[in-house]
Amino acid sequence: MLEGHDRLQYLVDKAREVEPLPDTAKTEDNRIRGCASKLWIIGGADTENKMQYQVDGDAFITKGTAKVVTDIVNGADKSEVARLTVEDFTPLGIKELLTLQRQNGLGELITRIIRIANA
């Protein structure tokens, strides 16, 4: 398990893996509220009912955190994602590295992921 600085570096590295969303996807409807920086998410189920999400943001830690979370749920069955809760992501240990405002944003991101799966 990574500790402190190594976890932050991991989040920055994950942020660098993010494929930018087109500007047309960076709408207020796709924006995650409650975060210190801007973060957008789009997603839905593919033809096999597997969830696929894409994120983008304007801050490395936020974008990296979102990438870690979406990597976990991408490819999962829609019904599995729909049953998740915010608490299911606690073992990741990311929350402890984030400011309170970023923790709120993480909760909003996970809530949106679940809402998209329930749509």
Regions found by a protein language model. Give the residues of each.
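N-terminal intrinsically disordered, cationic/polar leader segments
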Residues: 1-38, 45-50, 87-119
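Conserved interaction-surface patches within small, structured recognition/assembly domains
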Residues: 44-61, 70-74
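Glycine-rich phosphate/pyrophosphate-binding loops
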Residues: 75-92
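Residue-level signal for well-ordered alpha-helical scaffold segments within enzymatic catalytic domains
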Residues: 10, 68-71
